[in-house]
Amino acid sequence: MSLPADQTPSSNLPLPLVQFADRYKADLIPLSGNFSYFCAASLPFTEEDTRDYLEEPVAALPPAVLSRLPKISILIVPYLTHEKSDKASVSMVAPPDEKLSWTAQIRNNKETVLAFTYNGHDVSEYHYRFYQHISNLLWDLKDANARSRFSALLVEEGNAGVHGEVDEESWRTKQQLQRRNGKVKADSKIFIEYLKASFVDTMTLYLHGICCDIDVDTGPRQLPSRYLRKRLQLLQELFPPPVDYYVLPEDMKSSSRK
């Protein structure tokens, strides 16, 4: 559902995302819990798209995640573009590739706006970026128990000389950490940077795996499966999936036998 075409920007000039979000704040459509959304009317956004891009990803969020999140507005727009200031704008026409952004956000103390480019955005990539935003929000909530227990896993992996990571950012920060000679304290800046990247990347994978049947990339940079499983089991304990949702194959098999 969206506004009639004459109520959305007709100019080809990009509109700053902050202004776009403010202009259509009153037109947000409730989705579920603390989520709402707005879709630009110029888009061919069907009921199937509403299910794939909005309803299913939100429905798959664990209750323990939903209860911690602030109010979140999702904006689906034709294109997001950024200038030298890196501040995002909404564009009705395709920007040059070097100025295209797939996603952007606005955050304050009370609510968060998550905006996504629709045109050319594969639904699987959209899910990944959506859950990456959610994972970053969770990290910023500073859950002491989650951080402490995940940190302990990383220390255990480090002591065992475990190679690899989940995604690019955690791999990059792990390499930086490993280039340091000697032991690195768990409260040091470089370890905290790695802890954040690893938590966000692993949490993104965990949430995406609840929603969809995804394949984990294999290769020399990938965390060995038994260590990845331990991380997912920890996140499953901290943030159990909704009823009838599963992450690990054995959980689905166990449920089917009941």
Whereabouts are the PLM-identified features?
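Residues that form generic nucleotide/phosphate-binding pockets
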Residues: 57-60, 153, 238
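Histidine-centered divalent metal-coordination motifs
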Residues: 132-136
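Post-HEXXH active-site segment of zinc metalloproteases
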Residues: 124, 128, 139-177, 215-222
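Alpha-helical membrane-anchoring segments
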Residues: 175-181, 188
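Auxiliary, metal-adjacent structural segments of Zn-dependent hydrolase domains
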Residues: 33-123
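Short pre-active-site segment immediately N-terminal to the catalytic Zn-binding motif
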Residues: 114-131, 188-191
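Pan-zinc metallopeptidase signature
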Residues: 1-29, 184-258
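Long, low-complexity, intrinsically disordered N-terminal extensions of eukaryotic proteins, enriched
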Residues: 1-49, 56, 60-65, 161
